[in-house]
Amino acid sequence: KDECNFSYRDSDFKKNKYVLLEAEFRLDKGDTEALKKEVNETLTIRLKKYKPGIACPGSFFKNVQVKDLSRQQLEKIPKEKIVYEKIPAGYLLEEVGAKGAKKGEIEIAAFHANLFMNKGKGTSQDFFALSQEFRQKVKEKFGIELESEVQLIGFS
C-alpha cells in the first residue's frame, strides 16, 4: 500500500500511466453486518447517481481539495459547499451552467453537473471539447483549475 503512494484519486499507477492487469488484495477481517450495511448504503447512493445503462466514466473531474486553494479562491466558495475539506467539482460546474450542456452526442447530466454521458455515438473529441469548455468556465469564474479524474489518452 505504502509503495503505491495512494492519495486522493491518485497513485503511482496513475502518475506513471501504468495499466493494472491483475491485483491481489489482503484485507483485514471486519464486522460482517456493519460492512454489509455500509455496502448497501453506498450502492443505494451510487444507483441514484449512476442509473443502470448510463454510458459514462463516472465523475469526470476530481473534487477540489481546500488545502490546495488560496484564500482569494476560497472567498468565492460558500462555506456550506465545502464537504470533508473538499469542494465538489459538481458544484463548481453547476455554477457555470454545465447541467444539460451538450456537444454532439456527449451530454452533461441534468441531475449531476460532473457526470458526462455518451448518448449514442459520441466521440472522444466531443467529450474532450465539452470538458475543456467547462473547465475553462470554472477557471474564469472561480480561479480554480479542475483536474480530470478520467485518464485521457491522446489529449493534453
Locations of regions flagged by a protein language model:
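Phosphate/pyrophosphate- and phosphate-bearing ligand-binding catalytic cores of soluble enzymes
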Residues: 1-126, 141, 145-156
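Phosphate/pyrophosphate-binding loops and the adjoining catalytic core of nucleotide-dependent enzymes
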Residues: 134
